[in-house]
């Protein structure tokens, strides 16, 4: 959520900044309501001052044994008027808050201006795509032929875009999760948390999924609960409505979770295989930092996610998202895209974002430099470290062999106890 003072004092700057996102924002209603609210607050303060003056006069008259009936009636009338005005102010503040919740974050000045993903800017590449001496297969073909992925039964049991992992496929998924968590906790300094997979609406509001993206979420019928679309939601809200000790910042957390996304409008090739599932596993990285360090922390976060792919030996590239492709809550985002031979292209496997104080304002996460200091909003960051299903897909495709087997990346062998996946 944007700072209401920034919107009030510099509406033209906010509108122009959000135009770069492709958002045609009209702040007329917001500014009208804000002006009405401020006038009402002045009126309230004047009436409270008058009520206090009348109250003092009533006290003076009573001490002298003089009647004060008329003044008592006047004070009651003033109290009724103040209550009515307070109710009006509360209603207007509710409307202002609702409008603020729909306004996306302002892009950082370093974000390239562009209309959509075609104008994202490549930053760097790592590794060379493998040159096969045979025609490589897609991961869904490999998984079915090795009998380690069962899409048909997943569809039968639940519906489209649900999958059973079987045998060494299930073991590979688990190995990837454990490898990522071990790397981030032992080498990158993250503290692991294991969060709830169900959160309330306040948590979804805090990270920016609600109200804008309600149709992409799975809501539990009859309850104010949602299945999490990412561990970002519960882990960020871990400190909702708290004031943190500035000496304890930065705070780094990593978390494994299942993720659930309705994505009603999703279509095309990505809905085949493991690329775009309704349920998938992910290891998430979340940071709470001081504002002056947040962009340095974004670079570190991105490098931490990249390290997973480097150790797995998977070619990838990093792109910075342009303004038109930027997520609702993000001020700046790097996407890490892994090479998938079946696409003959790079596919997103991680998004690493700095939200600045956008989520912290919504979730009321602040910190104090010292006990007597004024609380300030933290900056929050998060990134996938990584999406597990897409990592498995990349391993199957990049490490496939002509005989139909798949070589297990060296760093995963201690977790699996095998160096190759064969059909049994």
Curated annotation (Swiss-Prot):
The keyword Cell cycle does not apply. Gene3D superfamilies: Bira Bifunctional Protein, Domain 2, Serine-tRNA synthetase, tRNA binding domain. Catalyzes the attachment of serine to tRNA(Ser). Is also able to aminoacylate tRNA(Sec) with serine, to form the misacylated tRNA L-seryl-tRNA(Sec), which will be further converted into selenocysteinyl-tRNA(Sec). L-serine binds at residues 230-232, 284, 384. It is found in: Cytoplasm. Keywords: Aminoacyl-tRNA synthetase, ATP-binding, Cytoplasm, Ligase, Nucleotide-binding, Protein biosynthesis. One of its GO terms (biological process) is seryl-tRNA aminoacylation. PROSITE patterns: AA_TRNA_LIGASE_II. Its EC number is 6.1.1.11. SUPFAM superfamilies: Class II aaRS and biotin synthetases, tRNA-binding arm. It comes from Carboxydothermus hydrogenoformans (strain ATCC BAA-161 / DSM 6008 / Z-2901). CDD domains: SerRS_core. HAMAP family: Ser_tRNA_synth_type1. This is Serine--tRNA ligase. The gene is serS. Consists of two distinct domains, a catalytic core and a N-terminal extension that is involved in tRNA binding. ATP binds at residues 261-263, 348-351. Homodimer. The tRNA molecule binds across the dimer. It catalyses: tRNA(Ser) + L-serine + ATP = L-seryl-tRNA(Ser) + AMP + diphosphate + H(+); tRNA(Sec) + L-serine + ATP = L-seryl-tRNA(Sec) + AMP + diphosphate + H(+). Coiled coil: none annotated. The keyword Metal-binding does not apply. Pathway: Aminoacyl-tRNA biosynthesis; selenocysteinyl-tRNA(Sec) biosynthesis; L-seryl-tRNA(Sec) from L-serine and tRNA(Sec): step 1/1. GO terms for molecular function: ATP binding; catalytic activity, acting on a protein; serine-tRNA ligase activity; transferase activity. Belongs to the class-II aminoacyl-tRNA synthetase family. Type-1 seryl-tRNA synthetase subfamily. One of its GO terms (cellular component) is cytoplasm. It holds the Pfam family Seryl_tRNA_N.
């Amino acid at each position: 959520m944007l700072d209401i003072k920034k919107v009030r004092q510099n509406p033209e700057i906010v509108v122009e900044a959000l135009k770069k996102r492709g958002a045609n924002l009209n702040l007329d209603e917001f500014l009208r309501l804000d002006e009405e609210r401020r006038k009402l607050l002045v009126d309230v303060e004047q009436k409270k001052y008058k009520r206090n003056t009348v109250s003092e006069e009533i006290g003076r008259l009573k001490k002298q044994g003089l009647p004060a009936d008329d003044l008592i009636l006047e004070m009651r009338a003033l109290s009724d008027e103040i209550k009515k005005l307070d109710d009006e102010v509360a209603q207007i503040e509710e409307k202002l808050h609702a409008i603020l919740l729909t306004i996306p974050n302002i892009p950082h000045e370093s974000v390239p201006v562009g209309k959509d993903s075609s104008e994202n800017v490549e930053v760097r590449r790592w590794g060379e795509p493998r040159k096969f001496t045979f025609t490589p297969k897609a991961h869904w073909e490999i998984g079915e032929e090795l009998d380690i992925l069962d899409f048909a039964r997943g569809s039968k049991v639940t519906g489209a875009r649900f999958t059973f992992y079987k045998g060494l496929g299930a073991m590979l998924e688990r190995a990837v999760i454990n490898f990522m968590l071990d790397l981030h906790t032992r080498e990158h300094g993250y503290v692991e948390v294991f969060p709830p997979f169900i959160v309330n609406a306040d948590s979804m509001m805090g990270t920016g999924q609600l109200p804008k993206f309600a149709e992409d979420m799975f809501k539990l019928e009859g309850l104010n609960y949602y299945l999490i679309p990412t561990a970002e939601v519960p882990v960020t809200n871990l400190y909702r409505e708290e004031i943190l000790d500035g000496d304890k910042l930065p705070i780094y957390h990593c978390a494994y979770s299942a993720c659930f996304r309705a994505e009603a409008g999703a279509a095309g090739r990505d809905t085949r295989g493991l690329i775009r599932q309704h349920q998938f596993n992910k290891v998430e990285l979340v940071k709470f930092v001081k504002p002056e360090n947040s962009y340095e922390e974004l670079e570190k976060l991105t490098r931490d996610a990249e390290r997973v792919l480097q150790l797995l030996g998977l070619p990838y590239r990093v792109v910075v998202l342009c303004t038109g492709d930027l997520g609702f809550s993000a001020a700046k985002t790097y996407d890490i895209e892994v090479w998938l031979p079946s696409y003959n292209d790079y596919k997103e496997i991680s998004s690493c974002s700095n939200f600045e104080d956008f989520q912290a304002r919504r979730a009321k996460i602040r910190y104090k430099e010292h006990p007597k200091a004024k609380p300030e909003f933290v900056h929050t960051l998060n990134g996938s470290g990584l999406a597990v299903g897409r990592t498995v897909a990349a391993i199957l495709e990049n490490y496939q062999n002509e005989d139909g087997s798949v070589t297990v990346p060296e760093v995963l062998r201690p977790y699996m106890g095998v160096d190759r996946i064969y059909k049994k």
